[in-house]
Curated annotation (Swiss-Prot):
Family membership: Belongs to the influenza viruses PA family.
Record flagged with keyword Metal-binding: yes
Protein name: Polymerase acidic protein
HAMAP family: INFV_PA
Record localization: Host cytoplasm; Host nucleus
Cofactor binding description: Binds 2 manganese ions per subunit.
Positions that bind Mn(2+) 1: H41, D108, E119, I120
Signal sequence residues: none
Major localization class: host cell
Gene Ontology annotations for the cellular component aspect, listed alphabetically: host cell cytoplasm; host cell nucleus
Pfam families: Flu_PA
């Protein structure tokens, strides 16, 4: 093919095509079909403009011989074939002198007679498919599109073909000649299919032997052989009526394609019921930290030593009492468990040498809280397969819950800035390859925007707790180990700080499978009075354990300190993902990068610096009942991060289902906004699939309510 291109096209065209490919890092020797396509496109652009001039009266004329009359002006400005910078310079100067709207993408020609840019397409497929792809890409009323095919068909905007019959016939003849020349050399099939990105390998080898028999066995019903099936598939025209296609495929399918209009979608139905409750593995906005600055005590970095040191910074402990009981639990046991923790920490201090880990005494309250001996005895299946009425436990349907306002508050808090930095600059990780300059600049800007974010604190807290719990689960399977919940950060002045949120006591943890559960009791400090939103704390027993002096604008005030206690559980696989929560930083960084890329491609230069440093510009963050919310680029970074972190903290099957199904509806609505006239069938079924995931999960319910806000504003 490469030889053919060099023989068939003018050397100037070949040179321009090579240059264009090199600019995009493509190799003409390897991507030969692309090489041929670029040459063909260049030649069509040049032929389009050849011999067309504008005379002194401004009329369009065709001059074929080298007329010495110098007053003629070329009718078309050729943009295709110039290097990008030069091409944009030409486009800008045309726009400045004629007042024509600047196109988003580089067009191929400018027509001085009709005063419009022209996009030329040459396709090996059907012209109207290619025309639609072009129109969708450039999305501009102003740029005129003209498509030619190798079979002599053409299509142009509003059937306005710009040139006279004869000029277009010259182009069609040339394309037909190229096609015949390729075909005579056996190059045409590969060239024709490469546009669709089809793989042409299988035409060159036959499937034989076992593979052939397997292929014949695995055909859909009613097909006798692979050939028979292949012929059927090849007969599928890619365009045409979907209903017809479906009925061709199966007699049982009768889908009516309904147009999807602004009035079609309805809001998602959120469940009724009592308000949903907090289900995260640790407290988020309600957490309270006991902290030490610039820790330098003996054994600093050993969690138990750090925890004891943090506990000693607080002097307001008092006799604990229950202020919000857990509806279903034996509440005195929760109270006894906390007293036991205090007593055993006191015992440690009385010892000569503080141990590195602490295993709690297996008291009755801890055995109850950790579900010790509660699991039904496992019986070998062999011993009971003859029992006639052997059946699984009936499990109750989960109770439907309604959306509560606390989860939106949790999310807002996660987007806020704290006064400490939770990650160092290199936390997102160096690139393995020699990292490009731009990528590291972006990473540093992004890190600066999110290092103080509360969502980042949740990441580090999650990583710490899951790592500690997984370690203890493997190292001390039978013990009720006491695990402090710790995080580390830096203050504004750059001083190190160690924080204690509370404690976890883990139960027996013989985790053979990824999904085997380890129970734990969490006890977390807080200043939030649980009686303000009792529904949020349904799964907790809350004790009042002390009084804390807080500095406020009016001086010192004393506030009760609470301890939120609950039984919880997790598994190896959940802890493994919890340890990987730093990935949320990477995910949100990639989302921001794609925004920068989009901006840069419009402006034709790298926009990283402007993107982060132009403080006046606002960006869309999300939808609320008030409309589209906007904010600074930092706010966008933190919101994307918080979403990613909440997807991790509140991961659940309901979220998986909701994300997958609602995305389909989202794409349909976006297609409607882009005027692509989407059609749907069984929209009711899609709504059912989405709504069956809306049961009781706070994060899913919040996302569904955001989705409804989006629907309202998108369809106005």
């Amino acid at each position: 093919m490469e030889d053919f291109v060099r023989q068939c096209f003018n050397p100037m065209i070949v040179e321009l095509a090579e240059k264009a490919m090199k600019e995009y890092g493509e190799n003409p020797k390897i991507e030969t079909n692309k090489f041929a396509a670029i040459c063909t496109h260049l030649e069509v652009c040049f032929m389009y403009s050849d011999f067309h001039f504008i005379d002194e009266r401004g009329e369009s004329i065709i001059v074929e011989s080298g007329d010495p009359n110098a007053l003629l002006k070329h009718r078309f400005e050729i943009i295709e074939g110039r290097d990008r910078t030069m091409a944009w310079t030409v486009v800008n100067s045309i726009c400045n002198t004629t007042g024509v709207e600047k196109p988003k993408f580089l067009p191929d020609l400018y027509d001085y007679k009709e005063n419009r840019f022209i996009e030329i397409g040459v396709t090996r497929r059907e012209v109207h498919i290619y025309y639609l792809e072009k129109a969708n890409k450039i999305k501009s009323e102003k740029t005129h599109i003209h498509i030619f095919s190798f079979t002599g068909e053409e299509m142009a905007t509003k059937a306005d073909y710009t040139l006279d019959e004869e000029s277009r016939a010259r182009i069609k003849t040339r394309l037909f000649t190229i096609r015949q020349e390729m075909a005579s050399r056996g190059l045409w099939d590969s060239f024709r299919q490469s546009e669709r990105g089809e793989e042409t390998v299988e035409e060159r080898f036959e499937i034989t032997g076992t593979m052939r028999r397997l292929a014949d066995q695995s055909l859909p019903p009613n097909f006798s052989s692979l050939e028979n099936f292949r012929a059927y598939v090849d007969g599928f025209e890619p365009n045409g009526c979907i209903e017809g296609k479906l009925s061709q495929m199966s007699k049982e399918v009768n889908a009516r394609i309904e147009p999807f209009l602004k009035t079609t979608p309805r809001p998602l139905r959120l469940p009724d019921g009592p308000p949903c409750s907090q289900r995260s593995k640790f407290l988020l906005m309600d957490a309270l930290k006991l902290s030490i600055e610039d820790p330098s005590h003996e054994g600093e970095g050993i969690p138990l030593y750090d925890a004891i040191k943090c506990m000693k910074t607080f002097f307001g402990w008092k006799e604990p009492n229950i202020v919000k009981p857990h509806e279903k639990g034996i509440n005195p046991n929760y109270l006894l468990a906390w007293k036991q923790v205090l007593a055993e920490l006191q015992d440690i201090e009385n010892e000569e040498k503080i141990p590195k880990t602490k295993n709690m005494k297996k008291t009755s309250q801890l055995k109850w809280a950790l579900g010790e001996n509660m699991a039904p005895e496992k019986v070998d299946f062999e011993d009971c397969k003859d029992i006639s009425d052997l059946k699984q436990y009936d499990s109750d349907e989960p109770e439907a819950r309604s959306l509560a306002s606390w989860i939106q508050s949790e999310f807002n808090k996660a987007c806020e800035l704290t006064d400490s930095s939770w990650i160092e600059l290199d936390e997102i990780g160096e690139d393995v390859a020699p990292i490009e300059h731009i990528a590291s600049i972006r990473r540093n800007y992004f890190t600066a925007e999110v290092s103080h974010c509360r969502a980042t604190e949740y990441i580090m807290k999650g990583v710490y707790i899951n790592t500690a719990l997984l370690n203890a689960s493997c190292a001390a399977m039978d013990d009720f180990q006491l695990i402090p919940m710790i995080s580390k950060c830096r203050t504004k002045e750059g001083r190190r700080k160690t924080n204690l949120y509370g404690f976890i006591i883990k139960g027996r943890s013989h985790l053979r499978n990824d999904t085997d559960v380890v129970n734990f009791v969490s006890m977390e400090f807080s200043l939030t009075d649980p009686r303000l939103e009792p529904h949020k704390w349904e799964k907790y027993c809350v004790l009042e354990i002390g009084d804390m002096l807080l500095r406020t604008a009016i001086g010192q005030v004393s506030r009760p300190m609470f301890l939120y206690v609950r039984t919880n559980g997790t598994s190896k696989i959940k802890m493994k993902w919890g340890m990987e929560m730093r990935r949320c930083l990477l995910q949100s960084l990639q989302q921001i990068e794609s925004m920068i890329e989009a901006e840069s491609s419009v402006k034709e230069k790298d926009m990283t610096k402007e993107f982060f440093e132009n403080k006046s510009e606002t960006w869309p963050i999300g939808e609320s009942p008030k409309g589209v919310e906007e904010g600074s680029i930092g706010k966008v970074c933190r919101t994307l991060l918080a979403k990613s972190v909440f997807n991790s903290l509140y991961a659940s099957p309901q979220l998986e289902g909701f994300s997958a199904e609602s995305r389909k509806l989202l794409l349909i609505v976006q297609a409607l906004r882009d005027n692509l006239e989407p059609g749907t069938f069984d929209l009711g079924g899609l709504y059912e699939a989405i709504e069956e995931c809306l049961i009781n999960d706070p994060w899913v319910l919040l996302n569904a309510s955001w989705f409804n806000s989006f629907l309202t504003h998108a369809l106005k």
